[in-house]
C-alpha cells in the first residue's frame, strides 16, 4: 500500500489517500509489462501496407524482345521484379497485427504499471470549477504548483474530460489527457509524472483493484 498526498488547485496539501493494488511478482513483472506494451503498440497498427506482385502490376503481357538473337538477356515480361516498374517480391499485404492477452493479465499489468509509478503520482482535487473557461496559462501554472517541471512528460488522468480542460491542455507541451477508464500500460510507463484527480483515482481503484 502506498500513501499519496492530495493537493488542491493552489498546490497545498489538503489530505491523504492510499493506493492499494495487487501487483505482479517481482520476477514476472517486467515480462507481463513487456507483453502489455507490445500488445498495445501492435493493436495500434493499421496493417494496410500493400504492394503489387508481378501478377497484379498493370502491363507486362507482351514479351519485350525475342528469346534469341538480340544479344540481350532473355526477358519474358517488362513487369518482372528485376525491372523498374515491375512487381514486388514478398512485399507487404494488408494484415491484422492485433494480439490477444487474457483479461486478468491485462488488469494485472495495468495495476503493476500504476504501482511502479507511485513515487511520481500526484493526486489533486477536482479542478474543473477552477477553469470555467479554457485557460492554458492557468493550467500550466497549476501543474508547476503541483510539482511538474517543463521537462516532465505528464499523463493527466480525469474521471471525465470537460471541454474547458481539454482546450486548456491541448497546447501544453508533453501533457496528455486521458479518462480514468481508458488508461493503458503504455501511456503510464512512458510518462515521467502522473497527475490524477481524486475522482479519477477512485474510479481506477473501483474498476481495477482486486
UniProtKB/Swiss-Prot annotation:
Segments of skewed composition (Basic residues): 60-71
- Example GO molecular function: rRNA binding
Q: Where is this region: Disordered?
A: 46-96
* Entry GO terms, CC: ribonucleoprotein complex; ribosome
Listed transmembrane segments: none
Q: GO biological process annotations for this chain's record?
A: translation
The secretion signal range is none
Q: Which key words are in the record?
A: Ribonucleoprotein, Ribosomal protein, RNA-binding, rRNA-binding
Output the PANTHER family linked to this UniProt entry. Answer: 50S RIBOSOMAL PROTEIN L4, LARGE RIBOSOMAL SUBUNIT PROTEIN UL4C
What is this protein for, i.e. what is its function? One of the primary rRNA binding proteins, this protein initially binds near the 5'-end of the 23S rRNA. It is important during the early stages of 50S assembly. It makes multiple contacts with different domains of the 23S rRNA in the assembled 50S subunit and ribosome.
Q: Tell me, how does this one assemble?
A: Part of the 50S ribosomal subunit.
The family line of this record is: Belongs to the universal ribosomal protein uL4 family.
The name of this protein is Large ribosomal subunit protein uL4
Q: Which organism is it from?
A: Gloeothece citriformis (strain PCC 7424) (Cyanothece sp. (strain PCC 7424))
Q: What is the lineage of its organism?
A: Bacteria, Bacillati, Cyanobacteriota, Cyanophyceae, Oscillatoriophycideae
